[in-house]
């Protein structure tokens, strides 16, 4: 039996990335940071290579919860489809890179899971127009590349997983 991958595709270098270290200098770090109380439940990607979409959906749900103390699932399948649009692989369960997923959240946003549910058999179908209209109201404003462990730890200490 062949080993099954989860669908992560390494990011290609992109000189257009905003670097995290240009935003804030590294601060004195706490001994421990635990953000789990603000995180939504980890969801099962099942047999689909949608790990980046699952991770990014969880991250967006975290950010939403920090703003309004309410959890609502965003559509992992919507994110996964649009990641693969950028990569030109919508017809395949090809996996995707985190950068393309983040670009998707910046450009298209994410609709709610109840609008475009995680039905694996629909992974290659374009989401409905209403999904894109809803998603436009739910975009991230910016993203910044993290290049080192100290930058990652600083980011976590500032409350950004």
Language-model features: locations:
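N-terminal zymogen propeptides
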Residues: 1-33
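Predominantly the structural core of cysteine protease catalytic domains
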Residues: 1-6, 29-31, 37, 58-61, ...
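Pocket-edge structural micro-motifs
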Residues: 22, 37, 81
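Asp/Glu-centered strand-loop micro-motifs enriched in Gly/Pro and often flanked by an aromatic residue
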Residues: 33-47
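Solvent-exposed, acidic/flexible segments
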Residues: 45, 49, 72, 91-98
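Alpha-helical support elements that line or immediately flank enzyme active sites
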Residues: 45-69
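Structural recognition of the beta-strand scaffold that forms the well-ordered cores
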Residues: 50-53, 78, 104, 161
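Acidic helix-start/capping segments at beta-turn-to-alpha-helix junctions
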Residues: 71-87
């Amino acid at each position: 039996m062949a080993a099954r991958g989860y669908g992560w595709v390494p990011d290609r270098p992109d000189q257009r990335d905003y670097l995290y270290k240009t935003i804030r200098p590294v601060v004195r770090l706490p001994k421990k940071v635990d953000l789990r109380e603000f995180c939504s439940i980890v969801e099962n990607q099942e047999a689909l290579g949608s790990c980046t979409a699952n991770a990014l959906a969880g991250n967006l749900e975290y950010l939403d919860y920090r703003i309004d103390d309410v959890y609502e699932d965003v559509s992992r399948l919507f994110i996964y489809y649009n990641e693969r649009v950028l990569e030109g692989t919508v017809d395949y369960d090809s996996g995707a890179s985190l950068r393309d997923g983040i670009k998707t959240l910046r450009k298209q946003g994410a609709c709610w899971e109840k609008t475009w549910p995680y039905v694996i058999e629909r992974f290659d179908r374009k989401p409905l127009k209403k999904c894109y209209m809803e998603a436009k109201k739910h975009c991230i404003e910016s993203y910044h590349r993290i290049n080192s462990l100290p930058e990652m730890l600083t980011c976590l200490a500032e409350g950004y997983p």
